[in-house]
C-alpha cells in the first residue's frame, strides 16, 4: 500500500511538473513575467486574504477543541497544518492528522481524532458548496466538459463531506460543528476574494462571473491534483483549460494560478516555521502517533 501510494505520488508530481513546463512554454514565459509584474500588489492583497483563511479556520477549530487547548498551541498547529495541506499529497487529511498529533498532549486521543474528522468533513462540505455556487452563477460561461467536470466535482466533494459527517458522527464532538462550517465557508469566501483580486490585476476587463468561473476551476484543479505536491500543473491546467470561458488569454490564466500559489507559499513558510518551533521539526509521523484514516 505504501509503495503504491509512493508510486502514485511520484507519477502525479512528474506529470504535474511536465505539464507546467508545457503550459509556460505554450503561453510564453516573457508574457507571463510581464503579467506577474503587473500583478505584484495584488499578490500582496491575496496573501492577506490567505491570512484571513488561517484566522477563520483557527476560529472554527477553537470551537471544536474548546478552552482546554492553549491558544498558542492551537495557532501553531493550525499554521503547521496549513503548510502541510498545500505542499503534501492528500494535504487536507495529512494536515488534520498533523494538528491532531500536535494537540494530543492537551486532550484525549479520541477527542483530537474526532475534531480532525469533523474538520475534514466540514472542509469537504465547504468546497462542495463553493463549487456549486460557482457552477450555478457562472453556468452561462461554462459549458460542455468543463461544466460537467465542475458539476461532478461539486457533487463528489459535497457528498463525501456529508457521508463522513454521517458515518463518523459518533466520534465527533457533539457541539461546535456549525461554527466550523461557518469558518470553512468564510475561509473559502476569502479564497474567492483573493482569486478575484488577482484576476482583476491580470485582466482588468474581468467581471464577477469571470471571477466565479476562475475560482470554480481552481477548486476543481486543486481536488484533481490532490496527489501531486502543491497541486503543481493541475490548478494551472484547470485555469488554462477554462481561460476562454473566463475571457482570458493563456498567459493571464497561468499568471493567476501562479500568483495564487505565491500567496499560499508565503503562509506555507510561516506554517513550517511554526511547526518546527514545537519540537525542532514538524511531527511528520502523525499516522503512527494518531492513527488517522481520513483520506
Language-model regions, residue ranges each:
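Short intracellular "coupling" helices and adjacent cytoplasmic loop segments at the cytosolic face
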Residues: 79-97
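Membrane-interface helix-loop-helix junctions at boundaries between adjacent transmembrane segments
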Residues: 100-122
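Predominantly cytoplasmic-facing regulatory/coupling regions of multi-pass membrane proteins
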Residues: 1-80, 108, 127-227, 234-237, ...
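Transmembrane helix boundary and interhelical loop/hinge segments in multi-pass membrane proteins
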Residues: 93-99, 234-239
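Hydrophobic alpha-helical membrane segments of integral membrane proteins
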Residues: 114, 231-232
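Structural signature of transmembrane alpha-helices in multi-pass secondary transporters
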Residues: 82-85, 119-123, 260
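Generic hydrophobic/packing signal
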Residues: 68, 87-91, 101-107, 129
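Hydrophobic transmembrane alpha-helix segments characteristic of membrane transport
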Residues: 62-63, 99-101
Amino acid at each position: 500500500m505504501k509503495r503504491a501510494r509512493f508510486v502514485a505520488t511520484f507519477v502525479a508530481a512528474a506529470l504535474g511538473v511536465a505539464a507546467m513546463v508545457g503550459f509556460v512554454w505554450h503561453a510564453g514565459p516573457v508574457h507571463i513575467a510581464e503579467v506577474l509584474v503587473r500583478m505584484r500588489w495584488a499578490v500582496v492583497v491575496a496573501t492577506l486574504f490567505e491570512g484571513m483563511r488561517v484566522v477563520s479556520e483557527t476560529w472554527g477549530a477553537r470551537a471544536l477543541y474548546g478552552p482546554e487547548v492553549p491558544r498558542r498551541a492551537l495557532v501553531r498547529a493550525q499554521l503547521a497544518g496549513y503548510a502541510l495541506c498545500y505542499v503534501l499529497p492528500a494535504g487536507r487529511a495529512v494536515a488534520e492528522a498533523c494538528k491532531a498529533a500536535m494537540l494530543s498532549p492537551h486532550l484525549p486521543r479520541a477527542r483530537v481524532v474526532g475534531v480532525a474528522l469533523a474538520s475534514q468533513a466540514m472542509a469537504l462540505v465547504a468546497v462542495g458548496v463553493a463549487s456549486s455556487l460557482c457552477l450555478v452563477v457562472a453556468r452561462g460561461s461554462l459549458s460542455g466538459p468543463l461544466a460537467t467536470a465542475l458539476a461532478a466535482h461539486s457533487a463528489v466533494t459535497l457528498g463525501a463531506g456529508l457521508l463522513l459527517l454521517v458515518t463518523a458522527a459518533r466520534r465527533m464532538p457533539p457541539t461546535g460543528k456549525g461554527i466550523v462550517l461557518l469558518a470553512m465557508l468564510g475561509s473559502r469566501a476569502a479564497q474567492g476574494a483573493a482569486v478575484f483580486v488577482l484576476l482583476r490585476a491580470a485582466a482588468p476587463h474581468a467581471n464577477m462571473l469571470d471571477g466565479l468561473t476562475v475560482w470554480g476551476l481552481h477548486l476543481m484543479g486543486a481536488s484533481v491534483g490532490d496527489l501531486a505536491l502543491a497541486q503543481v500543473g493541475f490548478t494551472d491546467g484547470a485555469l488554462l483549460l477554462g481561460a476562454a470561458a473566463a475571457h482570458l488569454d493563456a498567459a493571464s490564466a497561468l499568471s493567476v494560478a501562479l500568483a495564487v500559489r505565491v500567496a499560499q507559499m508565503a503562509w506555507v513558510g510561516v506554517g513550517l516555521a511554526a511547526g518546527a518551533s514545537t519540537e525542532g521539526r514538524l511531527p511528520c509521523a502523525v499516522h503512527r502517533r494518531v492513527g488517522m484514516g481520513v483520506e
